[in-house]
Amino acid sequence: MEAQTLYEKLWSSHVVHQEADGTALIYIDRHLVHEVTSPQAFEGLKLAGRKPWRISSIVATADHNIPTDHWEMGIQDPVSRQQVETLDANIREVGSLAYFPFKDQRQGIIHVIGPENGTTLPGMTVVCGDSHTSTHGAFACLAHGIGTSEVEHVMATQCLLQKKSKTMLIKVEGTLGRGVTAKDVVLAIIGRIGTAGGTGYAIEFGGSAIRSLSMEGRMTVCNMAIEAGARAGLVAVDETTIDYLKDKPFAPKGPQWDAAVAYWRTLKSDDGATFDTVVELDATSILPQVTWGTSPEMVTTVDGRVPDPAAIADPVKREGVERALKYMGLAPNTPISEIAVDQVFIGSCTNSRIEDLREAAAVVKGRSKAASVRRVLVVPGSGLVKHQAEAEGLDKVFIEAGFEWREPGCSMCLAMNADRLEPGERCASTSNRNFEGRQGAGGRTHLVSPAMAAAAAVTGHFTDVRTLN
């Protein structure tokens, strides 16, 4: 039998029908649903007189629009409140495998609660009306975002029309240095291949540095595969994967667990499998990263400088850098360490899991928020993460430092709720996108790891976290 990549195994095992032009009908195992991209889909089903094909595939929660403080006051914004109430009504009418409504102790960001509850399992196809569904590829799932019309299509048919992607292997070999995290790894990768480098590809992340990451770290890497232009990000199953899933509420039990694990162990690229493209990075060369512009590929090391457009020969790239620097309010050649921040956000589906909060708390402990920093938000990714963090006393570390400890939700990752930047404010953020206006009109976003965000919070500017430990 011909050697196959992990992507090819996942693809071939889910093809229902294939056309001569390569278009295929793919079966979907898990459908993640939230309040923003689902109302139109449910309405379309009702108008057509249809019901969801397999409600046991649906896992739903409210995350984008919900507030992260003063839950006793409910949702103040009328549009946000309507979306959340509509999701609640739709799910209660049609049913689901699992639904974690607003204020439920297990509620949280959809890409956090899926894995932590065991509803994301290796070998699945996973879709959601959300770009960062690629997160679930950390479990050797074929996972990607879909549009609202496709949300309805999946609900109605349990299938999706797709074309097969090319395959890319990104190998990160070696040992990561002190203070270097999964977020730094994926930002370094995007800095290397660019935001279009993965276009048309499913990226498998491999190498000793990737294998050394926890599942939380692997989710961070796969979460941002979409920011490299990829359709999906993947990591092969190993003992780390299996240990994480054991005893999760929706994971198989007893003999079914044993059978599942036996299958999961096959979910890796075969020896001799051929990738369309291979990229290699030396883990020892990766340093803490900070983005300086309005795209994740506009990134450098914490000891670096903002680029000088005058030194860029390509006129298109030069113009792009000039525009980014103007929006970000930065002068060419400014040292990254001299850039002051107004707010800090520790959260999002990229970096709001327990490991992320531990990393930030380790930096913050015994220190205080810099007087020049207006606000620091720490937003756990789910109620379960929040509960665990509080059991470990992490909330007290943040509160004593002058940070705000919030309820779970998407929060300041995107300006769809009350947590946002004011025009001109600069934020050190653990989220995944630094586009213009992403965190609020006129807001300026710099992407960093939780540890680096914590360092900026206590010093008032971007600081090499390795100098604080």
Swiss-Prot record:
CDD domains: IPMI (cd01583). Signal peptide: none annotated. Binds 1 [4Fe-4S] cluster per subunit. Gene3D superfamilies: Aconitase, domain 3. Coiled coil: none annotated. Keywords: 4Fe-4S, Amino-acid biosynthesis, Branched-chain amino acid biosynthesis, Iron, Iron-sulfur, Leucine biosynthesis, Lyase, Metal-binding. PROSITE patterns: ACONITASE_1, ACONITASE_2. One of its GO terms (molecular function) is metal ion binding. It catalyses: (2R,3S)-3-isopropylmalate = (2S)-2-isopropylmalate. GO terms for biological process: L-leucine biosynthetic process. It comes from the Bacteria. InterPro entries: 3-IsopropMal_deHydase_lsu (IPR004430), Acnase/IPM_dHydase_lsu_aba_1/3 (IPR015931), Acoase/IPM_deHydtase_lsu_aba (IPR001030), Aconitase_4Fe-4S_BS (IPR018136), Aconitase_4Fe-4S_dom (IPR036008), IPM_dehydratase_rel_enz (IPR050067), IPMI_cat (IPR033941). It holds the Pfam family Aconitase. Its EC number is 4.2.1.33. [4Fe-4S] cluster binds at C349, C410, C413. Heterodimer of LeuC and LeuD. Catalyzes the isomerization between 2-isopropylmalate and 3-isopropylmalate, via the formation of 2-isopropylmaleate. Belongs to the aconitase/IPM isomerase family. LeuC type 1 subfamily. PANTHER family: 3-ISOPROPYLMALATE DEHYDRATASE, HOMOACONITASE, MITOCHONDRIAL-RELATED. This is 3-isopropylmalate dehydratase large subunit. It comes from Azoarcus sp. (strain BH72).
